[in-house]
Swiss-Prot record:
Biased composition (Low complexity): 159-168
Alphabetical keyword list: DNA-binding, Metal-binding, Zinc, Zinc-finger
Chain positions covered by the region annotation Disordered: 28-60, 142-185, 296-319
The UniProt record lists the keyword Phosphoprotein: no
Chain positions of all zinc fingers (C3H1-type): 469-497
Name of protein: Zinc finger CCCH domain-containing protein 45
Originating species: Arabidopsis thaliana
Amino acid sequence: MNNMKRSKKPRVSWPPGPKLCQVKVFRTEDSPANVASQPQRHSYPSRKPRGPDLPPGFEGNHYAVKPNVSNIPRIKWKRPPPKFSVNDTWLVGCGGGSSEWQNENLRISKVLEAIYPHRSAIPSRPSVSPAVEAECFDDSKTPAIRLTPIEDESESSSEESSNSKVESGVTANKQGQLETKPLCSTQEQVSGLTGLAPDLSLAASAALTALMKTKEQGSLVDTELLIKFLSDPKLIKNLITDTSGKSSETKNQPIVTNINSATRPVPQPVSAVTASPMARKPQPVIIPQEHSVAVSRSFTNPERRVSPPKPVNGSISPPKPITGKPSSIPMPVHFHVGIAKEQPQPARFPSSSLPMNLNFHRPPNVFSEPKVIVNPQPQHQPYSAFRTSEMNYVQSSIGLGRGPQTGFNSYPMNFSRADAIGSAKPVVQPMKGLDYFKNLIREHGTDNHETNQYHSQTGIFNGRIDNNNKIHQQCIYFGTANGCNMGDSCTYVHDRYRPNFEAAAPRAKRMKFGRYERNGF
């Protein structure tokens, strides 16, 4: 093997030392002597030379002509500027005596500075002209600026003039009579005012001054009649007392009652009113239209007392008719006298004018204070009774809770068949009791924010989806970390008693060692 390697000849043969030289081959145009003299040739074709990139409007050739800067002569300083030398005897101050401080104050106050075309056009002070400074003005002589246009004022004046002409034609005779005898009228007025009280005299004097003004302007007031009223103090007092007496009579109008001697007067007023059922303390009793009667609110004196309850037949006769006032027809009524407890304000009955025949009886263990209920004489025997306690029991069974047993809820109501046939069946609104609001407060903050809502007439359930319409299958999203987005309106069943395994504490994170072992850690 060594012999074979030694026998091989080298492939490259080098000439001897004196003949050894370096040779480079160039093209004629790429020779070192001609590289910089000729431009380089590119393979892509040559394009047209682009002109200068000028904005529109500057394409003219005159912009390309530039002045020769070398031809402009340079100005040489004849003498250098004097050197600034600081003198130690100078005193530096704040500049209070300078004439520029006023101009500086104007600049500080942001007075606008204008550029004037010539020195002669510059005023002494741009904010105030010298002509205004030289003159002395009196502000009291300044005319007032009109708030309304002249056109509107002319229209209003024309309307007032037309109205005054019409009124002057109507009251010309009355004004003439007053002008002929102004002294006697004023004397009568003064003499009439002397007998009045100080307040009445002041009011009368104010009316007289207004009357004298209206006499000049013209009005439709009968001045003679007004003067006659004001000059008579007795007439003024009678007018005041009559108005106060009428108002007091209309407010407190008693009703004469003929009740058996076995019973004593009643302390608590009760009114049977069909037109105003929303009265507060006197409970409204609805009476059929056949026996409807208006009873005054001040039926009895509240200071009277009542004996133990006894059913007594009595009759109420309204007061005798007064001249100029309507009267009502007397009507027999039944009295059921009892002692009632002090109870809170009852809920108002929704139906205001239902033709019902009500017969109120005393429930056991309810009364502790005297109370009178007025009812008309029933014509027919009641065939069916509708108790509000049963209605409350139905409300509690459907989830609305038992309402407060006060007012109308604490008394049974008897509906006669004649009234039921003659009129439509009364619709009773379900009343929400105290338990309903307690449950609502207790459920606040949970997932169930909806309430049980029932239709007022048909009783259709308008709340959540009924369980009968739901698919009997557990919701896969309920109880998870994200939860069900549908909430109570979900068509699947949400089992609230199912154990929630996702809500448990998170487990410890498991370490993965395979990746570290492969990397050699």
